[in-house]
Regions:
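Catalytic cores of alpha/beta
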Residues: 51-61, 94-102, 119, 125, ...
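Conserved N-terminal beta1-alpha1 strand-loop-helix module at the mouth
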Residues: 1-64, 81, 130, 141-142, ...
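Glycine-rich phosphate-binding active-site loops on the catalytic face of alpha/beta enzymes
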Residues: 65-75, 108-118, 140, 144, ...
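Histidine/lysine/aspartate-rich catalytic loop segments that bind and position anionic ligands
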Residues: 65, 69-115
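Glycine-rich beta-to-alpha transition loops that act as phosphate-gripper elements at the mouths
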Residues: 1-2, 26, 46-52, 68-72, ...
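Short, well-ordered alpha-helical segments in soluble proteins
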Residues: 111, 125-128, 157-160, 182-185, ...
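A contiguous pocket-lining binding segment that forms or flanks enzyme active sites
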Residues: 103-108, 120, 127-130
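CoA-thioester-processing core
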Residues: 79, 86, 118-128
Length: 194
């Protein structure tokens, strides 16, 4: 709802991490993207994009990027045609090769934790040296630093920063978790540019 969107966005901005993927599996996802995009101080994208219609709707309400759980060529091609960054989910070498054929160099590794976590990144990175990954699924404060320290990782995605208990506690609770993630990123030697 609007109040939760405001708490999350306010907390991320205050915590120095003004980037948010809103999962469209939430019935309020499109409205949240529209509300947060209108603020202008948060880079907001649509997550769990499953088809071209969701992609179109997300772009219409202001999504600056799209993330999909899998590699769907139609979604990737439509996003690239629209000039919007797209991060499709991959888990296997075949998925990664399909992404490379579509011109992608950055891919969401999903579900990272269930698929082997850092061991999977270690196995895939030397085979695909031109690809950078965003682990998602099973990422937490416990393993965030290990992921971000890996040169094949450009970002990580997780819901712990905006967990329901933090949202209920307010923007400062979200900001505290965001600050912790920013500190982990810095400790891992990852600047904002990677």
């Amino acid at each position: 709802d609007d109040a939760a969107a405001d708490v999350i966005a306010d907390g991320l901005v205050a915590g120095g991490l003004p980037v948010l993927e809103v999962a469209l599996r939430n019935p309020h996802g499109m409205a949240a993207i529209e509300r947060i995009a209108a603020r202008g101080d948060v880079l907001v994208g649509a997550g769990t994009v499953l088809d071209r219609e969701q992609l179109r709707q997300a772009l219409d309400v202001g999504a600056a990027f799209v993330v999909a759980p899998g590699l769907d060529e139609e979604i990737v091609e439509a996003a690239l045609t629209a000039g919007v960054p797209v991060l499709p989910g991959v888990m296997t070498p075949s998925d990664i090769q399909r992404g490379i054929r579509l011109g992608l160099e950055r891919l969401k590794l999903f579900p990272a934790g269930a698929a082997g976590g850092l061991a999977l990144v270690n196995a895939l990175a030397p085979v695909f040296p031109g690809v950078r990954f965003m682990p998602s699924g099973g990422v937490s404060t416990a393993n965030l630093g290990e992921y971000l320290a890996h040169p094949a990782v450009f970002a990580a995605s997780g819901s712990w920063i905006a967990a329901p208990a933090r949202i209920a506690a307010g923007a400062e609770a979200v900001a505290e978790a965001a600050r912790e993630a920013v500190a982990v990123r810095a400790k891992a030697g990852m600047g904002a540019g990677r």
